[in-house]
Amino acid sequence: MAAFKDKKNGSWYVQFRYTDWRGERQQKLKRGFATKKEAQAWEREFLMQKQADINMSFESFVALYEKDVKPKLKLNTWLSKEHIIRTKILPYFKKRKLSEITARDVIDWQNEIRQHTKSSGESYSPDYLKNVHTQLSCIFNHAIKYYGLQINPAAKAGNMGSEQPKEMLFWTKEEYLKFIDAMMDKPMLYYAFEILYWCGIREGELLALTPADFNFEKKTLRINKSYQRLQGKDVITTPKTKKSNRVIQMPDFLCDEMQDYFKQLYGLEPDSRIFPLSKYALKRGMAFGCKASGVKVIRIHDLRHSHVSLLINMGYSAVAIGNRVGHESVEITYRYAHLFPTVQKEMADKLNVERGN
């Protein structure tokens, strides 16, 4: 591989031709290398990447992985994935050849990562460690599926951390009514929490709502988007899942409340966000209401659990509840099984009748 010295500034550069994925010949020029060896190494790595050679560096393969995967993901999903790759994975493996990383290397990496702590000094949770390992494993799986790598060393090494069941907190109707009574003098937060509790929608779905999503004649609320704050910008995305696209029937009192709220909003356009709040503002409002009312502290997302709990207590099926909140019925059954009344005794009694006892 030839490298050339720039007579003007003394640095090195490479210039070469290669065949791209369309089969067309392309020319590449790269300047600014301090040494001839660095210039040649860059050319070699570039060509291995273009040829999908698994002897390329891990860092080069991650660039391919980003090119392949990023367009398929929502921006917030990719940013979460990219942060882990950049801070927890690349610093350890970037200079290694993709094909030479072993399960032993992954175990050594796991042991190193386990020693890391948050800025507060706390250890990382088992959930987070599992997620970090999963991101590494995803990279190797991608290399196996599309680039000819034979073995996933991360899978062979075994997982790091474990998925912990998250504690499910929720308010009873009585607790919620105490809380919302304390929010009466904060109109925007009051109506936001009313929608969250009585409709069971997600936080991002709430913050993306516009007047066009409400049909007061039919008393319905349309959910077809979600709000995120990403890289300092407000971003409206599609909802979390396909099932999340839904139309929710609102109770009469909530319809009346929202019409009253709209009258308070000056210059409201059909596509304006009706709750121009941040997630932090909602969280702060929740903390205020909990303290003022004396009810137990729960997360914003737990209002969704509270809505599901209320519907279960009212006797609705997992299918009906799943359709309302945008979950599959099997997921509702799995997550909230402990809240559904048992029917085992009723089943046994009916089997007795069938047999003739």
Functional labels for PLM-detected ranges:
Residues 83, 173-177, 226-229, 251-296:
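Active-site/catalytic core of tyrosine-dependent DNA strand-transfer enzymes
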Residues 7-108, 265-270:
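N-terminal DNA-binding module of tyrosine recombinases/phage integrases
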Residues 170, 227, 255, 280, ...:
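Catalytic-site neighborhood detector that most strongly recognizes the C-terminal catalytic loop/helix
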Residues 109, 178-182, 232-238, 338-357:
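DNA/chromatin major-groove-contacting recognition/catalytic segments
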Residues 127, 145, 194, 198, ...:
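C-terminal catalytic core of tyrosine-transesterase DNA break-rejoin enzymes
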Residues 67-156, 165, 187, 276-280, ...:
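N-terminal core-binding DNA-recognition domain of tyrosine site-specific recombinases/integrases
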Residues 13-15, 159, 208-260:
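Conserved tyrosine-mediated DNA breakage-rejoining catalytic core shared by Y-recombinases
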Residues 122-126, 130-132, 145, 149-209, ...:
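Basic, Lys/Arg- and aromatic-enriched nucleic-acid-binding interface segment
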